[in-house]
Amino acid sequence: MLRFAVLGHPVAHSLSPAMHAFALESLGLEGSYEAWDTPLEALPGRLKEVRRAFRGVNLTLPLKEAALAHLDWVSPEAQRIGAVNTVLQVEGRLFGFNTDAPGFLEALKAGGIPLKGPALVLGAGGAGRAVAFALREAGLEVWVWNRTPQRALALAEEFGLRAVPLEKAREARLLVNATRVGLEDPSASPLPAELFPEEGAAVDLVYRPLWTRFLREAKAKGLKVQTGLPMLAWQGALAFRLWTGLLPDPSGMEEAARRALGV
């Protein structure tokens, strides 16, 4: 039987078990997908168990960056991004990948979001790094903003991007919220309503709540919008393919996540 899990802290409300239960059932595979609460200090011990008994695991906060030092091999893309969200176990060896970046691009394509720049990524943390990397690899001009300007400058220098003030949002054609604003306070948005552009698209990686203030205000401006669920589903589907060689239906995984959210 195939064993999978998501490791992180906290993970009690993770949507990954629901998505991967759908993936296993829809493909006729026998297996389980668990949520293992794993604080940072517990990571080395958990990975020993993964080596012994699991086909693969997903990693979420706060483990994506720390895991690199504990793996036997890390993909070049994950090394550049500096984060691993998917681990494959083969004969006791652990291989690390990042499916957040390709999952983001696949979600845009599936949702009919035009890949037109300039793209402004709000947030220079782990999620922002993956998105900025993906958009740059897709050939877009990428701008980055962060509440702490030094982080935006560091990311811009590392990836060959441009750190900009928030006011440049008016000139962007793709806005991506990769901050936690909206998650911690549903009434908050990282972008004042008057700074949204007149045309383009907006994506929020936050999916609790599903319709954040950022997305509601973008939609009110006439922008094409996408919630955080399609990227969540696509990164999960791509992870599942790395583990099994089979690609589950991302729209089915998204629907499973939506049901688990109760929306």
UniProtKB/Swiss-Prot annotation:
GO terms for biological process: amino acid biosynthetic process; aromatic amino acid family biosynthetic process; chorismate biosynthetic process; shikimate metabolic process. Pathway: Metabolic intermediate biosynthesis; chorismate biosynthesis; chorismate from D-erythrose 4-phosphate and phosphoenolpyruvate: step 4/7. It catalyses: shikimate + NADP(+) = 3-dehydroshikimate + NADPH + H(+). It comes from the Bacteria. Belongs to the shikimate dehydrogenase family. Involved in the biosynthesis of the chorismate, which leads to the biosynthesis of aromatic amino acids. Catalyzes the reversible NADPH linked reduction of 3-dehydroshikimate (DHSA) to yield shikimate (SA). This is Shikimate dehydrogenase (NADP(+)). It comes from Thermus thermophilus (strain ATCC 27634 / DSM 579 / HB8).
